[in-house]
Amino acid sequence: MRFKKHLLGWLAATLLFSSQTQAAPLVLATKSFTEQHILSAMTVQYLQKKGFQVQPQTNIAAVISRNAMVNKQIDITWEYTGTSLIIFNRIDKRMSPQETYDTVKRLDAKLGLVWLKPADMNNTYAFAMQRKRAESENITTISQMVAKIEQVRQNDPDHNWMLGLDLEFAGRSDGMKPLQQAYQMQLDRPQIRQMDPGLVYNAVRDGLVDAGLVYTTDGRVKGFDLKVLEDDKGFFPSYAVTPVVRKEVLEANPGLDDALNTLSGLLNNDVISTLNAQVDIEHRTPQQVAHQFLQDKGLL
């Protein structure tokens, strides 16, 4: 009888272990730019260290990722608060960073999506200039840039300012038209040069445009010594990156929330800008950058 009890106990433990090891991996979806590639590598390496199985899916567009998450095909993503507010929930009201987070957390909870701890960073849009030029012309805000554009328009129309923009920004609800309205910015069509987002940084650095639309945490801002202009009218929403997980996945994986919150707690604008630069300028891989960062933090 005692042998039979031991045998049953061993079989139960074996089945439990087998079910754990054969559990479906957590599906992690990230977008198609450097910052998201780094977040993907960081998440995979750290969660695997903590005993979770992870299946990364990269280069997934925001809307596709969102729909897949709602349909339970994706378990985890790193999303930006402003994207959920404006694109997914279609709210254009200007809010503080905390209001933005609280709003998307509340609304997305109705879909079974849990917003965890937001990183202390804001990868929002901004205009940037060559630092030396911005300092020499005493331009630190978008309003001052607009005033300079108008001054040149009035006094030297043959040398009107050129702005570099990515192709998507012109059509966004937080894009060029409402920006021009908010700042009373007058631009003729030839003054706007649309290009691939990555080319904007080079165009500003090389003087091909006078100012360009950038992402504030892009490593090339620091690497190319660009000056980010203050959004003094508070036009651009907050884009704090945050781990978002399906509620049932969190409930089925104890400790997952703590692990992801640990990662988000390490990130701020300076940190992520430095990591982005290591990939975009130093040409290291996202996996190498993530591994070194986690090692330096004592997490691997």
UniProtKB/Swiss-Prot annotation:
GO terms for cellular component: ATP-binding cassette (ABC) transporter complex; periplasmic space. Transmembrane segments: none annotated. It is found in: Periplasm. One of its GO terms (molecular function) is transmembrane transporter activity. InterPro entries: ABC_Gly_betaine_transp_sub-bd. Residues 1-23 form the signal peptide. It comes from the Bacteria. Induction: Induced by osmotic stress. Part of the osmU operon, which consists of four genes (osmV, osmW, osmX and osmY). The keyword Transport applies. The complex is composed of two ATP-binding proteins (OsmV), two transmembrane proteins (OsmW and OsmY) and a solute-binding protein (OsmX). Part of the OsmU ABC transporter complex, which is involved in the uptake of osmoprotectants such as choline-O-sulfate and glycine betaine. This is Osmoprotectant-binding protein OsmX. It comes from Salmonella typhimurium (strain LT2 / SGSC1412 / ATCC 700720). The gene is osmX.
